[in-house]
Amino acid sequence: MLILVSPAKTLDFEQPPLTQVYSQPDFLTHSQELIQVCRQLAPSDIATLMKVSDKIAGLNAARFGEWQPDFSLDNAKQAIFAFRGDVYTGFDADSLSEDEIAQTQSQLRILSGLYGLLRPLDLIMPYRLEMGTALSNPKGKNLYEFWGDTLTQAVNEALAESGSDIIVNLASNEYFKAIKPKKLQGQLISPVFKDCKNGQYKVISFFAKRARGMMARYIITNKVNTLAELKAFNLAGYYYSEEQSSPTNPTFLRAE
């Protein structure tokens, strides 16, 4: 199985990584193009474009200015240890074994507005550039047009290398929109997580994000290879619901 997840806004570049093993992102020339565009933006432009405070806009203007593609452990960190936030809290990479971390490198891919498609051990420098940002660039009016078919092709290549034909989409809609499902060369599965609130089951963003991270970890640590094995996911009180599921959207429920 190849797993797709979103990145996180929250970053941790303070804690040292748990391994000295790393790789370099595949699309750094693309990243450089975007950085050049972003460097032309004033902090006030960034604040408007990204809908962030002046303080965060200033921080990211500085990050764009400092960014350079010669990554090492001195100025960058592996993506899986740099990203924090709900999905990554659920995934809890810090407690994986060396073998499990190595397994993530072939099975997990992180979609990114700046870096395109990241392997877990790819080095990244601090940034904020969400996939849904309407950043005008030489290839179009937003990042979806900038990346075009590039990320879909990269997912297909990663799927072929993984030896599987199942793609488990645990990314948000904003990020998965950068992928063209009809061009994927595998079976696409997009799990849904619902929590019971006031007697009704519904997707609650905070819980769903954590559940996506937990499922990604479950696939890695349990060596899940089939849809039947995926349906056995039962962490944090979730259970598979045949009634609420469809062939492409296995649905997991959790009671109040």
UniProtKB/Swiss-Prot annotation:
It holds the Pfam family H2O2_YaaD. InterPro entries: YaaA. GO terms for biological process: response to hydroperoxide. One of its GO terms (cellular component) is cytosol. It comes from the Bacteria. Belongs to the UPF0246 family. This is UPF0246 protein Sbal_1048. It comes from Shewanella baltica (strain OS155 / ATCC BAA-1091).
